[in-house]
Amino acid sequence: MSEPLPAPLPAPVVAAGTPISVPLEKGKEYWYCACGRSADQPFCDGSHEGSGFTPIAFVAERTGKALLCRCKQTGSPPFCDGTHARVPPERVGTSYRVDERDAGDRGAMPTPRATPEEPDLELIHELAEHGLEAVGSEGPVGAMGVPRSLLPHWDDLQILTAQLARRPLEADVPVGTELVIGPRAARPLRLEIPLLVSDMSFGALSEEAKRALATGAERAGTGICSGEGGMLPEEQAANHRYLYELAPAMFGYREELLPRVQAFHFKAGQAAKTGVGSQLPGVKVSARIAAIRGIPEGQPARSPAAFQDLRTPADFRRFGERVKELTGGIPVGFKLSAQHIEADLDFALAAGADYLILDGRGGGTGGAPLLFRDHIAVPTIAALARARAHLDRRGATGQVTLIITGGLRTPADCVKALALGADGIALANAAIQAIGCVGSRICHTDRCPAGVATQDPVLRRRLDVERASLRLQRFLGATVALMQVLARACGHSQLRDLNRNDLASWHRDLAELAGIAWSGAAPPPRTLG
């Protein structure tokens, strides 16, 4: 069955009946409001969330004033082309679209507009007109992960609860929630719950967001991962279950930091942009971030695609053994995205991994080339099922901790992930939403309206650290409590006892992806009569 075509965009709001002259700086990137809702016209402030619109990125070609469109009818955004003259004054502040038959010179070439039938039309025209000059060497960039509508749905996995063949547990029966990361390590990391805050760097997130996440996780009895931007001292001090991530750029890494961490992992990749490295825009590299990362202020922070001096399992094993020597034996693991899953897991196991953080398609980031975000990686549901099956085959189950991440949001999602074989779940998007993120998907612009993914001091002041940390604590506590409700209904007194027998799906393809039972009745064999 073919997928339904996406609905056409609604008409934008006419923000004003005239253009506005604004100063631009050559080489600087700006984000133009396309929806008309922004209070910071003509630039985006995140108000497009839920509108179906996305802001338009452009780089100023020269320093000076430019006349930018506010009527949202221009055929050459962000610049005014005179179309505002055709907008009735009474339509200011309302949704409106000029009839394209009257929108410009009848003798001129028409303006390309993407349609449900040809959704890539504008990209093709952009590449044909400008090459990579405007969009950058890796193509257009977007924030967060693949839209959820393009992924297998956790909601299409059904939980099978107990009744006769297995009895459910009463509401007063305790349900264990502990997660031990790296049980074979000399100093395994013990969390009170199987949820933790995933890797998000200081730089991608504000200091206030990092402190709120660390404090909220600590209050909930769980840990936080550092992200690849180095150790923010205030974050580390706020949480005594701190998992340090070392990425190929090795930002700010020094051995003297190791006694302050409780687990350590190498970053091999992340679902939204594995194989291409990463970059924090220079506008986000404040003096504090530059000092922690050991890089120049105001310059882009680039991380290579792979470690330069660590290539073989033996190389990583030697590095990991040094980490253990300096820390008394904390767990050492890998964060990897779901690509060549079995081969990459074998590499990590050969390198001595105590734990694995597997990021499936659906996992997000502050900014990734859409060429990668929208076209790489195995979806989280299938990736998790394959990883657990492979660890079972290798005899690593119970020895190497498997933590899944990438698109999980709700208590039901987390229960299903545990049943599919995850030992723990690392939450990124859900965690930042709990502290205030409203899903504007403009993290890479430094204009986050909630103060979460920005270094702008005015926007950062919107995030109250204490209030945000309490929100995360409540979210994690409520999520685990609801997970316990479902575990009792399935007859389990430990969350870790959830298994594939607790799941089925009426989507046959999804059942095969997940390695679980199909809910339907298989047809009887055909006979010849």
Residue ranges: model-predicted function:
Residues 221, 239-242, 260-263, 350-355, ...:
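Glycine-enriched alpha-helix->loop->beta-strand junction motifs that scaffold or abut catalytic
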Residues 30-42, 66-77, 356, 408, ...:
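Cysteine-centered iron-sulfur cluster-binding motifs in ferredoxin-type domains/subunits
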Residues 2-14, 67-78, 82-112, 460-464:
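Flanking helices and flexible, charged tails adjoining ferredoxin-like Fe-S electron-transfer domains
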Residues 2-42, 46-68, 91, 100:
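N-terminal pre-ligand scaffold of iron-sulfur
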Residues 304-460:
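Glycine-rich phosphate/ribose-binding loops and adjacent secondary-structure elements
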Residues 101-195, 199-215, 222-223, 230-231, ...:
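Conserved, well-structured core domains of diverse proteins
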Residues 200-202, 229-231, 247-249, 269-271, ...:
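Active-site beta-loop-alpha junctions enriched in small/polar residues
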Residues 409-414, 418-518, 522-523:
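Gly/Ser/Thr/Ala-enriched C-terminal appendages of enzymes
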